[in-house]
């Protein structure tokens, strides 16, 4: 899905569907291999590109599918999740996990766009999908991305540790990018410069059905990812990358997205000879591991 193709459609949707008609404005990225009517990118992954215009506000709701937001464009918007107000900046990852109230608004002056990634297909298949409307949330002063901002150091007031399933709801891109650059500099022999978004209290995946990662390709690097059982999604945050998947080759510009089926190797090439490229990846690994079907070939 080329962002240059999606963006004009999103802006047109903004003209045609004000908030009075639809409180959330999304273009679903449906994989024709699964049937367009199913509106899914893989067996367990739903993708959508959502637009928020200046001054808009979408009321609070909660739902059973887990979701994340990878911010694609713009600034000045925010998402409030469980009372925590999360600023939205390009490349940030924001969680809206199962059962948590969330709403969003825009105080800036330019359109804001993000990529929605949900485990909706599997939750819908289990006949467990629903959504409930809610009231506007009171905003808390605390923020998880500040309290859990250093690796290996966690809050423990009077020796008590957090038992929240999602202690961190916002993963700033500035920090993930710095971690990748630091890892690349510290381990120049490392082929796959990659980090995983995790719960800092447990080390487990940030959400319990889908996994989320950031990958850095060194200048001019070609990296072969092994064939694994889970399907996966690649979204380019920065740079220019060629993705070879089975017999198809995609050239990804910034904000472009593509999918790879399970059990297929993927080769990624950074087309920039003098600068790194950065890729956001979502996959079904946590689900496959829990079901005992995870496999690398």
Regions found by a protein language model. Give the residues of each.
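Double-stranded beta-helix
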Residues: 107-169, 271-297
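A short, N-terminal "cap"/entry segment at the start of jelly-roll beta-barrel domains
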Residues: 1-43, 132, 139-209, 213, ...
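Conserved metal-binding segment of the jelly-roll/cupin
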Residues: 81, 87-109, 114-119, 245, ...
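A short beta-loop-beta micro-motif enriched in histidine and acidic residues
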Residues: 35-46, 53-68, 83, 202-211, ...
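A short beta-strand-loop-beta hairpin characteristic of the jelly-roll/cupin
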Residues: 53, 57-90, 96-100, 105, ...
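Short beta-strand micro-motifs in enzyme catalytic cores
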Residues: 46, 113, 193, 211-213, ...
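Short, flexible loop/turn elements at secondary-structure junctions
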Residues: 31-33, 51-56, 64, 72-73, ...
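C-terminal functional regions that serve as terminal interaction/effector modules
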Residues: 1-4, 201-206, 212, 219, ...
């Amino acid at each position: 899905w080329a962002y240059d193709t999606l963006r004009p459609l999103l802006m047109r949707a903004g003209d045609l569907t004000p908030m009075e008609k639809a409180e959330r404005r999304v273009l679903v990225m449906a994989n024709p291999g699964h049937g367009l009517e199913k509106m899914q990118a893989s067996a367990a992954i739903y993708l959508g590109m959502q637009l928020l215009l200046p001054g808009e506000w979408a009321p609070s709701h909660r739902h059973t599918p887990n979701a994340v937001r990878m911010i694609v464009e713009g600034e000045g918007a925010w998402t409030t999740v469980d009372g925590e107000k999360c600023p939205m900046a390009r490349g940030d990852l924001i969680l809206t996990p199962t059962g948590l109230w969330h709403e969003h608004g825009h105080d800036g002056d330019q359109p804001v766009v993000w990529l929605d990634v949900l485990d909706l297909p599997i939750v819908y298949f289990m006949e467990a999908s629903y959504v409930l409307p809610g009231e506007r949330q009171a905003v808390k002063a605390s923020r998880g991305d500040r309290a859990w901002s250093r690796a290996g150091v966690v809050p423990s007031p009077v020796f008590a540790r957090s038992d929240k399933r999602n202690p961190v709801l916002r993963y700033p891109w500035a920090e993930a990018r710095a971690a990748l650059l630091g890892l690349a500099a510290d381990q120049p022999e490392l082929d796959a410069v990659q980090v995983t978004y995790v719960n800092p209290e447990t080390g487990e995946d940030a959400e319990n059905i889908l996994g989320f990662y950031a990958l850095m390709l060194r200048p001019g690097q070609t990296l072969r990812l092994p064939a694994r059982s889970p399907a996966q999604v690649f979204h380019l945050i920065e740079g220019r990358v060629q993705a070879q998947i089975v017999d198809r080759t995609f050239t990804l510009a910034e904000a472009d997205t593509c999918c790879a089926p399970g059990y297929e190797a993927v080769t990624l090439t950074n087309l920039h000879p003098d600068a790194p490229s950065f890729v956001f990846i979502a996959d079904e690994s946590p689900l496959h591991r829990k079901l005992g079907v995870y496999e690398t070939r």
